């Protein structure tokens, strides 16, 4: 499963994202994070058990401050 997440860039953002994934016992197989002009773009490839686990992850990520957008790609 591949997700693209946009945030207003800030310190400890990557930590917050990985903690959200870890809390659901999901594995990250790849992560690419870039920042440009105050916007952080993060593309994560995850091992997802089912759609319910994905929805729980989206809910957790939506609670992270400064979220702009999250989408499945």
Predicted features and spans:
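A conserved regulatory-domain signal marking ACT and ACT-like small-molecule sensing domains
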Residues: 1-73
């Amino acid at each position: 499963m591949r997700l693209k997440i946009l945030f207003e860039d800030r310190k400890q953002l990557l930590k917050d994202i990985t903690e959200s994934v870890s809390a659901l016992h999901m594995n990250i197989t790849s992560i690419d994070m870039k920042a440009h002009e105050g916007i952080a773009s993060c593309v994560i490839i995850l091992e997802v058990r089912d759609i319910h686990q994905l929805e729980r992850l989206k809910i957790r990520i939506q609670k992270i401050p400064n979220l702009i957008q999250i989408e499945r790609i």
